[in-house]
């Protein structure tokens, strides 16, 4: 086991809405010590009963240890003509097992999001990350628990909600790989039947690639076109991610 159990417990204690945001991406469990990363994400889609939602973010991440990667983001959200909302996000990823030591690699993600330009609740997320391989196929599946916390002193209580991510990737060559991605939310984590109105799922084809540019530097990309179902999920979502690693 790569990460001491103490860190696993602390991470779970620090962090505890089921809708998959238009710029969400599939988390990977692996961590590379010393790696620095500038990360840009973008997503856009229109839910059945709402206006177009556009989300973009810019972040900087660092592989602080062999098992811990930390990243800070600034995120901008726009919905129709209602103006922009700016959020700050702190993401921490922990690699729990040595890569390839067991048939399934495992990690843990924790994330805290706070409003910057407007009042609103904080959000926290935590969940296990899984990855396995069959020949040139790479499979990922993540289970996430999310909760909002009131920041205005109103004492508003929010439920803990469950969401998921999955990805299938065929590693054709380093510069171009293809597959599919899926995101979804089930509503309250312990009351899926009563949360049917909040349930939403999206799935679609995806492409991936990595271009080495020398001296441990690389540019990575992935993008997907997702088809959604549910009252809160856009019928079609375009999402993309561009990373510069150095």
Model-identified regions with their sequence ranges:
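Cleavable N-terminal export/targeting peptides
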Residues: 1-26
């Amino acid at each position: 086991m790569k990460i001491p159990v103490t860190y696993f417990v602390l991470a779970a204690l620090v962090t505890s809405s089921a809708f998959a945001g238009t710029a969400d991406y599939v988390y990977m469990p692996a961590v590379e010590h010393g790696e620095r990363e500038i990360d840009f994400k973008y997503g856009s889609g229109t839910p059945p009963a709402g206006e177009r939602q556009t989300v973009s973010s810019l972040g900087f991440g660092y592989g602080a240890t062999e098992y811990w990667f930390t990243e800070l983001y600034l995120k901008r959200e726009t919905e129709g003509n209602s103006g922009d909302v700016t959020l700050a996000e702190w993401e921490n990823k922990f690699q729990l097992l040595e890569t390839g030591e067991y048939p399934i690699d495992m990690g843990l993600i924790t994330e805290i999001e706070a409003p910057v330009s407007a009042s609103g609740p904080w959000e926290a997320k935590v969940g296990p990350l899984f990855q396995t391989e069959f020949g040139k196929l790479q499979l990922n599946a993540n289970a996430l628990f999310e909760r909002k916390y009131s920041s205005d002193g109103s004492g508003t209580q929010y439920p803990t909600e469950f969401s998921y991510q999955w990805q299938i990737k065929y590693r054709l060559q380093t510069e171009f790989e293809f597959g599919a991605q899926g995101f979804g939310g089930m509503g309250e984590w312990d009351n899926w039947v009563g949360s049917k109105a909040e349930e939403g799922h999206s799935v679609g084809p995806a492409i991936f690639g990595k271009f080495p540019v020398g001296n441990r530097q690389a540019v990575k990309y992935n993008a997907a076109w997702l088809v959604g179902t549910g009252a809160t999920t856009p019928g079609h979502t375009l999402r993309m991610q561009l990373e510069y690693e150095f």
